[in-house]
Amino acid sequence: MVKVLVVGLGKMGISHLSMVRALCGVEVVGVVDANAYLLGVLRKYTGVATYGTLDRALEEAAPDAAIVATPSRLHAPMVRQLLDCGIAVFCEKPMTLSAAESDELAELAAERGLVTQVGYHNRFVGTFTEVRRLLDLEAIGSVTHGLAEAYGPVVLKPATGTWRSKRTEGGGCLYDYAAHVLNLVNWYLGQPCAVGGTTMTSVFSRETDDQVASTLTLPGGGSIALSVNWSDESVRKMTTRITLWGTGGRIFADRQEIQVYLRDGTPPPDGYQPGWNVKYTTELTPAESFYLRGEEYTAQLEHFVTRVRTGTLEGINTFASAAETDRLIEWLRRDAGQHRDPALAPDVPNGVARASLSARLRSLVTAR
């Protein structure tokens, strides 16, 4: 029996709690949250032990593993505390708000021989998994260009008041939406060698971004165009799409289907033929023991629990792989000018920069 502690009772925490309680061979030994009222209701109707602090839960619950679903800024200290106690960790994405911290936590987990996983659920979607399989088979040859997209109706009017509306808390389109497709890019093609032309635009939000666009340069010379918008009311819910062009064909995938075009002369994998091929998520996704929101959410938790039970360190979405995505996110922030690094550029106040620019323009006009 794997004893699991759930930390955080927001949207994702409640979702994870309902799913992990339904898994065979799992005992939820406690739930941690700062909201006493919410804990009281949960304790009354489920009988699950509840704790107001992580310290107390670790003293009394003795978990084998923990699911961390708190606001993103709290991930790093909580995950470090759990690892120091020898506890396997499933952490919601992004792992942390600092690539350096993510690297440190990945190294700490490796040193202690602990199972880790981050909640990039798209790697458990049948269509996206099939993309990875086809790329491993070199079905479309060398990838020369791609388009990574995510759209959704999250922020459709000015709003404040939650951590998701503040970049410093880990909120915003880049951390919440773009992270998912960037993680798929890492999975499919490795780490890009450069990013450029990044824009992070606010549509309705005051303190964070609602749209992200960029160009990612691949080590082999190809490129990926990134287009993400969580203020798009034309879609009913989050929609993630990947399109890849290669020397031997083209792949398009979203959650519902994968479309593959193979050029004549390209040896097709089993189940495919030259020209257009279409496969649907219903034929690519195995049935799960419990359904809520999507098969992939249960699948990722089953994968984590199985690895904890067997002590398998290698797996899908480990801390080490998630740290790559955190570093890519950091590169995009720097490229967009949202994060000024003193080592990269002097910290010039906006007023001084504007005055300096005005002086240069006047000198050019005078010279003419």
Name each model feature, range by range:
Residues 30, 65, 145:
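Short, Asp-centered acidic motifs that coordinate Mg2+ and/or phosphate
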Residues 204-207, 222-299, 315:
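NAD(P)-dinucleotide binding in Rossmann-like oxidoreductases
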Residues 122-205:
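Predominantly a Rossmann-like dinucleotide-binding segment in NAD(P)-dependent oxidoreductases
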Residues 48-54:
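Conserved SAM-binding strand-loop segment of SAM-dependent methyltransferases
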Residues 1-45, 361-364:
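N-terminal Rossmann-like dinucleotide-binding module
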Residues 58-60, 65, 71-72, 76-123:
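Beta-strand-loop-alpha-helix segment that lines the small-molecule cofactor/substrate pocket
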Residues 65-68, 289-291, 296-368:
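C-terminal helix-rich "cap/oligomerization" subdomain common to oxidoreductases
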Residues 24, 45-47, 85, 188:
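Short, structured coil segments at secondary-structure junctions
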